[in-house]
């Protein structure tokens, strides 16, 4: 991949990430938060140590609903949340140690999940470029990358959900299948099934 292409993807990703923060900051200032549903805010599941910090930052939109489950699994293991596949929270747990996680639901788990999700999506964009470049022109591929980045629901890839990791593994499996490297295609396909249930559908495609 040429340096100019990498710079294009990196700059597009940074702009996308910045734009996603704008409505969060605006909403935090202008809209009233109404707590009550147990999976809508990380502050509701916090210990007292970091709760004041979490309350001052617009964090909860990036880790609510499924995100809370993944962080809980990473910090406490499985309880009654067996519907969430293990690869994503398994990655969060060791990375959180880098941020100094020491207690259950420490904010380090949030930042670890956030870093993994966004890093996986950035890597997915690079693999997406490589995969599409097999069949399409540079202009078509870059247009496709922008379409993926600025699709209305692309914010899921920036949240602490497994979508970004799933996309990365799907693209890696597909790319190596196109290159007829069946060992790596199968390896990433296997990891795909550890991320979401529908990952098993990759094998008939391969």
Can you name each region flagged by the protein language model?
Residues 94, 112-135:
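Transmembrane-helix motifs of polytopic, lipid-linked glycan transferases
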Residues 103-111, 128-150:
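Transmembrane-helix signature of polytopic, membrane-embedded enzymes
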Residues 1-50, 133:
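Start-transfer (signal-anchor) and selected internal transmembrane alpha helices
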Residues 158-165:
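Short acidic/glycine- and proline-prone juxtamembrane loop motifs at membrane-interface regions
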Residues 61-105:
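Short hydrophobic/aromatic helix or loop-helix immediately within or flanking a transmembrane segment
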């Amino acid at each position: 991949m040429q340096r100019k292409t990498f710079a294009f993807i990196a700059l597009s990703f940074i702009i996308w990430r910045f734009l996603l923060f704008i409505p969060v900051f605006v909403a935090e200032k202008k809209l009233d938060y109404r707590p009550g549903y147990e999976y809508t805010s990380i502050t509701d599941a916090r210990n007292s140590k970091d709760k004041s910090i979490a309350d001052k930052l617009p964090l909860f939109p990036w880790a609510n609903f499924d995100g809370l489950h993944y962080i809980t699994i990473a910090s406490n293991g499985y309880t009654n949340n067996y519907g969430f596949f293990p690869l994503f929270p398994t990655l969060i747990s060791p990375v959180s140690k880098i941020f100094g996680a020491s207690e259950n639901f420490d904010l380090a788990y949030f930042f670890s999940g956030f870093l993994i999700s966004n890093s996986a999506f950035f890597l997915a964009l690079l693999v997406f470029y490589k995969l599409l470049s097999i069949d399409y022109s540079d202009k078509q591929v870059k247009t496709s990358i922008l379409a993926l980045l600025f699709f209305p629901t692309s914010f899921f890839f920036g949240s602490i959900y497994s979508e970004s990791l799933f996309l990365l593994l799907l693209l890696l499996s597909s790319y190596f299948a196109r290159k007829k490297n069946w060992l790596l295609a199968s390896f990433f396909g296997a990891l795909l099934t550890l991320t979401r249930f529908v990952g098993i559908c990759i094998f008939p495609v391969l």
